[in-house]
Amino acid sequence: MFYKLLEKKRNEWLSSPDCTVKDVISYIEQRGKMRDAQIDAIKTFLYLKIVCGNQPLKQLFSQGFFNTLDIREEPLTDTARNKLLTDKTAAALYEYSKLKRKNGEQLSPKLEEYIKAHAETIDYQQIISKIFYNVDYADYLYSLPMGAGKTYLMAAFIYLDLYFAQNEPDNPVFAHNFMIFAPSGLKTSILPSLKNIMRFDPSWILPEETARQLKRQIKFEVLDEASSAKGSNIIN
């Protein structure tokens, strides 16, 4: 449900004159190789990186980063209204409670009513922390339908990160190295798929010359538990 708030702010940025990735998105769409679900995820990925600074969702939500609701138009008591107008964290949780599910039902009408009645006594930060499992690092989950191309999306993220990292080498938001983990019990089915990352054509998302340069620079190393243990300094 939280994604709806993020998506709205993301789309506002993409259509604004402040958006710095319009050319990248336009190229990807015109190239026609990535699927709609992949492109949508790339838009979100770039928004979280560039605009949100790769901050934890808990932190972004608490800062009111995705607030869009006009509190002045809400049916609230003066006490509740003043609280929500002056506390971005409170306003964020209130807006969250009013989100609609796919079937049209409100996400949490009980939470909405509780906020209205107890606006000044709620520990909003604690509730938001629980919503995001008390995670204090950037923990983003991109959920795509089966067969939508999750492996190639991972490859696209890697190449885009490297592209921006080269443009801004001192910007900690963009990564220079990557690690992908696969559960050992499923490695026979997952690892072959993950190896497709090495075969991804970066010209699907970046201009030919830029794509060739990145392709020449990137190095892949596939490790498994047995070979990694042999080369480690672990003493049993």
Where do the language-model regions lie?
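RecA-like P-loop NTPase motor core of helicase/translocase proteins
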Residues: 1-236
